[in-house]
Amino acid sequence: MKVVLDTNVLISAFLTDGICARILRRARNREFAFILCRPVLQEFLRILREKFQFDEGEVSFFTAIVSEATWEIRQPENPFPGICRDADDGAILVCAAEADFLVTGDDDLLILEFYGKTKIIRPREFELLFSN
C-alpha cells in the first residue's frame, strides 16, 4: 500500500504521541510504503524552524526519522493549480496521484475525498485500516 502523508500529519507525529505518531512508526516499520513529497518535506522543515522554533540539531533528528520512514521521495513536476481550494495543495495531489491514500487533516484536501484512485482520508480513518 502506497501512502502520502501531509505536512500536518508529520508535524503532529512529533508534537504528540497520538495517532499520527503511530502512523509514522508504522511507516518506519515498513507496514506501508511512505511516499514523501518534496514540497511537504520543505514545509515540514520550515514549520519546525519558524513556528515551533526547534534548533538545527532537533530539526536534523526529526529529518532523520522521516527519512528512515520514507520509501520514496517525489518531486511534482507540474503541480496543477485550481484542483482544490488551497492552490498550494496542488503539489501534494500530484505526488499522491499514484498512491492508494493521502492522509491529511487539511479540510481543503479532505473535501475532495478522492484524487484519481487516491483516497483522501484523516489519520484516524487510516489508522483504523490496521485494526483488523
Identify the residue ranges that each predicted region occupies.
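Extreme N-terminal starter segment of soluble prokaryotic enzymes
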Residues: M1-K2
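PIN/NYN-family metal-dependent endoribonuclease catalytic core
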Residues: L5, L15-E50
